[in-house]
Amino acid sequence: DLIGFHGQTILHKPQSKYSIQLGDSKLLSRVTNTIVISNFRENDIINGGQGAPLTPIYHQFILKKIQSKLPSAMINIGGIANITYMEESNKIIGFDSGPGNYLIDEWMRSKTDKEFDSGGLIAKSGHPNEGILNKFLSNPYYKKKFPKTLDVKDLNSQNLNTLNLEDGCATLSMLTVKTICLALGSFKNPPKLILLSGGGRKNKYILD
């Protein structure tokens, strides 16, 4: 047995060649009496990678196991949304498409006593603000070619202060949808199968 431990990222700057995580892998190994493998992000950056996302290898395993038609894609909608695209050669490409749940959750916490928009129901009762949405989408990150990664500290919801709860949720949820669509549109051959994972897969507004 062994433990793969990636820690909790507090700062991620691959362009500056560093990524910092909380967590003591040596202590975890002593406490559990188990071999612990860690520093995935740091080692990937040292070897020329972006240090994120970490999920593509697992996604590749899943797509192979179900013998999906290729090319195919798996979208993980966590705090940040990331996409794994598997080509017909089984080669994989992985990158962050944009915000997933992070901005929505931050908005909910700032306006309510809830941690998230359960099922996307609040977003479904609102309307996205196109002007504010376009300001978000003007971020050059979304036109940048992969490989690329996002740090949550690069995201903020300050442009939403004029909106009510429902419209803010709808705007941020639509931002997640739009940036995923932009990422999928960057592939020459569209995926024949798309699988969803992460908490965002339960958000009916995003799915619709």
What residues fall within each predicted segment?
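Short beta-strand-loop/turn "lid" adjacent to the catalytic site in phosphate-handling enzymes
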Residues: 1-25
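Phosphate/pyrophosphate-binding loops at sites that engage ATP/ADP/AMP, CoA/4′-phosphopantetheine
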Residues: 1, 181-191
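Phosphate-binding/catalytic loop of phosphoryl-transfer enzymes
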Residues: 14-19, 34-114
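Conserved ATP-utilizing enzyme core subdomain
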Residues: 90-181
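Glycine-rich phosphate-binding loops at beta-strand->alpha-helix junctions
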Residues: 10, 191-208
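Generic structural signal for well-ordered alpha-helical scaffold segments
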Residues: 59-64, 177-185
